């Protein structure tokens, strides 16, 4: 199985470097010279890292296969993957990968409120994007207090939202009737 670790952004400079949206918690281990990535779309890869450096909190990667800005523009938006067999056991001690969470039912008590559509890894905390049956997106802070249970085998996550979480995301949303999130 493959794990997405980055998405390629815009070109940087004239030597083929690109900005990268990092989707892993260990960029210093994943993005080192000589690392080869499976790329989606397949026509853009595989790609092998030539250089990696940080510029104002933005990761810049150079690839052996990309010589100039024009070639870098062609791979813009491509997704970089590693094979999960390459992951060490340390990586599996805690936490989940996006591919494990996407598609799980999001529940408040016994009420299904939607499905997990994405996981955004951010510097302060991760966010889950839950899509409701009406097609609206709700951003849920992925912290133990709000998402106390993740049951990949059972196909769901349990949410205990604080009052107002659903309204913050959408003025027309209704709080689930389960009573979860009441402060009293």
Swiss-Prot record:
SUPFAM superfamilies membership: PRC-barrel domain (SSF50346), Translation proteins (SSF50447)
Entry's Gene Ontology molecular function annotations: ribosome binding
Annotated localization: Cytoplasm
InterPro entries the UniProt entry points to: PRC_barrel-like_sf, PRC_RimM, RimM, RimM_N, RimM_N_sf, Transl_B-barrel_sf
Record carries keyword Repressor: no
UniProt key word rRNA processing: yes
Gene Ontology BP, a term: ribosomal small subunit biogenesis
Keyword terms of this UniProt record: Chaperone, Cytoplasm, Ribosome biogenesis, rRNA processing
Origin superkingdom: Bacteria
GO cellular component annotations of the record: cytoplasm; ribosome
Pfam families linked to this entry: PRC_RimM (PF24986), RimM (PF01782)
Subunit structure: Binds ribosomal protein uS19.
Family in the record: Belongs to the RimM family.
Domain notes: The PRC barrel domain binds ribosomal protein uS19.
NCBIfam families: 16S_RimM
Role, per record: An accessory protein needed during the final step in the assembly of 30S ribosomal subunit, possibly for assembly of the head region. Essential for efficient processing of 16S rRNA. May be needed both before and after RbfA during the maturation of 16S rRNA. It has affinity for free ribosomal 30S subunits but not for 70S ribosomes.
PANTHER family per record: RIBOSOME MATURATION FACTOR RIMM (PTHR33692:SF1)
Stated name of the protein: Ribosome maturation factor RimM
Organism: Paenarthrobacter aurescens (strain TC1)
Gene (name only): rimM
């Amino acid at each position: 199985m493959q794990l997405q670790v980055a998405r390629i952004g815009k070109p940087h400079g004239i030597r083929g470097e690109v900005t990268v949206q990092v989707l892993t918690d260990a960029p210093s281990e994943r993005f080192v010279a000589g690392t080869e990535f499976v790329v989606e779309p397949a026509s853009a890869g595989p790609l092998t890292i030539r250089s990696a450096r940080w510029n104002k909190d933005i990761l810049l990667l150079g690839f052996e296969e990309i010589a100039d800005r024009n070639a870098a523009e062609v791979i813009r938006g491509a997704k970089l993957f590693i094979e999960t067999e390459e992951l060490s056991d340390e990586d599996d001690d805690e936490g989940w990968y996006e591919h494990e969470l996407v598609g799980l039912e999001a529940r408040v008590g016994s009420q299904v409120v939607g499905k997990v559509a994405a996981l955004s890894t951010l510097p302060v905390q991760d966010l889950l994007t839950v899509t409701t049956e009406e097609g609206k997106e709700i951003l849920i802070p992925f912290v133990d207090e709000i998402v106390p249970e993740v049951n990949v085998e059972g196909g769901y996550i349990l949410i205990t939202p604080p009052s107002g979480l659903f309204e913050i995301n959408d003025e027309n949303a209704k709080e689930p009737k389960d009573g979860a999130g009441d402060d009293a």
